Amino acid sequence: MINDGIRGGYSAAALAYAVANNPLMKTHPYNPAEKKVWLMMFDIVNQYGCCMLGHLPVSNFSFLEDPTVMTEEFISSIPADGDDGYLLEVSLEYPESLHDAHNCFPLAPEHYQTQLEDLSEEQRQTYTKIYGKETYKGSSKLVTTLHDKEKYVVHYRALQLYLQLGLRLKAVHRVIKFHQAPFLRRYIQHLTNLRAQSKNPFEKAIWKLMINSIYGEFYCPFFFSIKPTHRSR
């Protein structure tokens, strides 16, 4: 169940389009009769470090005997800094009323077996040009869709966000409860401060690596690091 919740990194190119109406721009005429529109690009750094500042799973992992006690009201009330955390396997409904608003960046990424009807017209033409009439077999991709989610494994804090943004909880199938604590906070804060005080590219890189490598070790499934050995007598 835990491995089902590990999906990797998601990237996408959205089709959202905006036109700036900025009085400070010299390359595009400003129209004072229209509303001011500013386009901004954000480069958000240290996201791995930010994740590890919070409460993380530590011990006492166990399945709840009755997962139905995890109602939407109860899930929404779980504190981010509480002693207990939860990993849930749920079914979610993606209301059609949210589709237009969420179209460029849907919630709850998942591994999905793509179908021919999922492709754009241009992609279908490209496929036909290359493979002719060969049946499209599809492949598993990490994607965001507006489909309902069945037996979707998710951390309770991510689920709280999904519910807050309008997804509906249909069912709770399994729940793992665990003790959580901010056991990495002081160390991550120390490395972050050292990175901020860096005076050259090498120092910035080494402190960044020491933060990100910890995240990577937590991300790797434990069984990947187990190497069976055989000793003959």
Where are these regions (language model features)?
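Conserved acidic
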Residues: 1-233
